[in-house]
Amino acid sequence: MAKTPVRTRKRVKKQVVDGVAHIHASFNNTIVTITDRQGNALAWATAGGSGFRGSRKSTPFAAQVAAERCAEVVKEFGLKNLEVMVKGPGPGRESTIRALNAAGFRITNITDVTPIPHNGCRPPKKRRV
């Protein structure tokens, strides 16, 4: 019995000029997601997924490598301008923005969208080391 060839649909690369880079910088990891203006994800990368494990995930260099990996993928979409949204207090905040700038993107706007509670949940107790 002859097998019928499996047909895969050819993926159409959409051209996106303006995008939004969402940077989530926690104390343990940094997540970089680049979306179009509507919020559809084009690419994402993390410090942990870039080969850093344990305490090395939470370094500025790991965040920089994650941003460079994400920028490589997004270059194929023809992205030129980026608006940056930074969330969280982590060590990868500035280095991620610098890496995106060095990758050749024109950064139009940097916004801090860190959620600040209006006296909401009780914070975790202080560490005793």
Swiss-Prot record:
GO terms for biological process: translation. Pfam families: Ribosomal_S11 (PF00411). The keyword Membrane does not apply. Keywords: Ribonucleoprotein, Ribosomal protein, RNA-binding, rRNA-binding. It comes from the Bacteria. PROSITE patterns: RIBOSOMAL_S11. The keyword Disulfide bond does not apply. Belongs to the universal ribosomal protein uS11 family. This is Small ribosomal subunit protein uS11. The gene is rpsK.
